[in-house]
Amino acid sequence: MKLLEERILKDGDVLGENILKVDSFLTHQVDFELMQEIGKVFADKYKEAGITKVVTIEASGIAPAVYAAQALGVPMIFAKKAKNITMTEGILTAEVYSFTKQVTSQVSIVSRFLSNDDTVLIIDDFLANGQAAKGLLEIIGQAGAKVAGIGIVIEKSFQDGRDLLEKTGVPVTSLARIKAFENGRVVFAEADA
């Protein structure tokens, strides 16, 4: 997605050898116009897949997931990283390791929001080691729902996440694919959409 790649080049900051900081438009402050365009691209890609729910993990995946769900006309569910006292009924859970935060979280979705009648589109902000999407695949599997695809806003193709996810047989669509960071600059690979 050219618009996204241009924004990454303009406002993204490369930190070290494998971190891209995009807090000015995705991971802290949200550019809703860009997120709306991202949502439309994902919706167009999966419009024939019979999507009934869009699923993400809090927090930075919420904005693109909301706009994808809106464009598809379906609900969006976000897996919570901390169980709260209102989550008293059946809970679907998985452990997820965050590459950026370097912590493992137990993420949860209330079971009544997903069923074996659902066809899900997973959306996430980044794909690095694939653990977030893998955890969501596990939760969705616990519900007996089907996953039509995984939509990634920014993929770090030099890490092993895509390989991990492709082994599941679920299609992966990344709007910006980063081949490398060279001398503090982003080098893109060809995107999926």
From Swiss-Prot:
The keyword Mitochondrion does not apply. GO terms for cellular component: cytoplasm. Pathway: Purine metabolism; XMP biosynthesis via salvage pathway; XMP from xanthine: step 1/1. GO terms for molecular function: xanthine phosphoribosyltransferase activity. 5-phospho-alpha-D-ribose 1-diphosphate binds at A128, N129, G130, Q131, A132. Xanthine binds at L20, T27, K156. Its EC number is 2.4.2.22. Pfam families: Pribosyltran (PF00156). GO terms for biological process: purine ribonucleoside salvage; xanthine metabolic process; XMP salvage. It is found in: Cytoplasm. Its main location: cytoplasm. Keywords: Cytoplasm, Glycosyltransferase, Purine salvage, Transferase. It catalyses: XMP + diphosphate = xanthine + 5-phospho-alpha-D-ribose 1-diphosphate. Disulfide bonds: none annotated. The keyword Oxidoreductase does not apply. NCBIfam families: PRK09219.1, XPRTase. Converts the preformed base xanthine, a product of nucleic acid breakdown, to xanthosine 5'-monophosphate (XMP), so it can be reused for RNA or DNA synthesis. PANTHER family: HYPOXANTHINE/GUANINE PHOSPHORIBOSYLTRANSFERASE (PTHR43864), XANTHINE PHOSPHORIBOSYLTRANSFERASE (PTHR43864:SF1). Belongs to the purine/pyrimidine phosphoribosyltransferase family. Xpt subfamily. Homodimer. This is Xanthine phosphoribosyltransferase. It comes from Streptococcus agalactiae serotype V (strain ATCC BAA-611 / 2603 V/R). The lineage of its organism: Bacteria, Bacillati, Bacillota, Bacilli, Lactobacillales.
